[in-house]
Amino acid sequence: MPRQIITTDDAPRSPLFSQGVRAGSQVFVSGTTGIDPSTGTFAGDTIQDQTRQALTNCEAILRAGGAGLDDVVEIGILLTRPEDFDGLNEEYARWFSSEPPTRYVAKLGVDVPGLLVSIRMTASLD
């Protein structure tokens, strides 16, 4: 099964990994942060601001791969501060209120100044 690298200017890029990969009917979105691609800086310093931007970035990568939020079957979330869990859920519920995908949340063990959240997704087009 051939794989297609997904790129978009509507989400931040890294020289170390692809924004996303499409393999057959699966679309994989790399860990995506709350960086605003137009400024190159974090979209804010609250968990709600960064979660909103990270989800916006993930959605842009999904679109570039031919998928949408309704196609997402799994989401992985890494938080730098466990106390942000409730704020994360507050913003997350605005995006996935009915028939949400599976999800896990874990603590991110890497300390990056300003980073509060990283989100990855898997979508299925079947």
Kindly give the residue locations of the regions a language model identified.
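N-terminal presequence-like segments and the immediate start of the first folded domain
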Residues: 1-56, 60-73, 79-126
